[in-house]
Amino acid sequence: MNTTANTTNIIVGLSGGVDSSVTAALLKQQGYQVRGVFMQNWEDDDNDEYCSIKQDSFDAIAVADIIGIDIDIVNFAAQYKDKVFAYFLQEYSAGRTPNPDVLCNAEIKFKCFLDYAVGQGADTIATGHYARKEVRNGVHYLLKGLDRNKDQSYFLYRLKPFQLERAIFPLGGLEKPEVRRLAAEFNLPTAAKKDSTGICFIGERPFREFLQKYLPTDNGKMVTPEGKTVGEHVGLMFYTLGQRKGLGIGGAGEPWFVAAKDLTKNELIVVQGHDHPLLYTRSLVMNDLSFTLPERPKAGRYTCKTRYRMADAPCELRYLDDETAELVFDEPQWAVTPGQSAVLYDGDICLGGGIIQTTDKPVIITR
């Protein structure tokens, strides 16, 4: 728990889930002046069967009532659409696979929400993320959560120092089973509620059907690297590198995997076998760099995650210019995907990272 003696007025982002519920209950129990905010960030189809916003808001209000705190419902839908969703569609249109949760944290939860909370007189905000923060010589460090299965520092790497200074993560030192147990002890209605796995704030819905509402689709061939047609795709944007399920390619032999997208020919390049060489990468180039500390890390040796929950991969960081860097891995990495984030670590410290643009394999072909 990372608070300071004069941090008494805390506004908690209450999502209607168990993690934020326990966050608020713990802070209230510890004597802080706590208020809640439920963020409504999606309105396009919030009455359909897949959107949980209404139920989530009811759950957040019920939690606030049991804990004994006030709660505001604040609408950031316009900001979400402009800052997060537009980027989400742009990246899919370009053949990449974005991570909206990363941008949602940087632009909505730790910008719009933070600005709102400060305007309401809060000393700091709290969220239910599984991450930790330490202050050393006045510098705020973002650290991995102790529960390695739930660590969410990967999604927080774009937080700037001023955002970290105003944020706390009370669950960072807890494991998920303990959080569930505390929720039951606090008699919270979210104690047994399942974790959300959908797109940030949009919910769990059939992805293909959802994306088709916003982007045109164009069927094309699935081909091998040698040019042999083995199937048909329903639109390049619906596939990601390393994907195995949903390809619909029959026949004998090992399973098929997506290895690349040829945007010029509208072809999906597929290979057989998890260990096919085209699925492995020794280096990547990332841009749109963002770091959590006042000074960017020096070029040198670190570890990196190129997707959530992967094991840290030793690598060397080399800057190409102020906005671009190259990572060279000690060992080949599987299915490194443009549009996803490459996040750097020094031990448990999350240093920041960038958006993967290219790798040493031609995975997004545009000419």
Swiss-Prot record:
The keyword RNA-binding applies. Pfam families: tRNA_Me_trans, tRNA_Me_trans_C, tRNA_Me_trans_M. One of its GO terms (cellular component) is cytoplasm. The keyword Signal does not apply. It is found in: Cytoplasm. Residues 150-152, 307-308 are annotated as: Interaction with tRNA. HAMAP family: tRNA_thiouridyl_MnmA. Belongs to the MnmA/TRMU family. This is tRNA-specific 2-thiouridylase MnmA. The gene is mnmA.
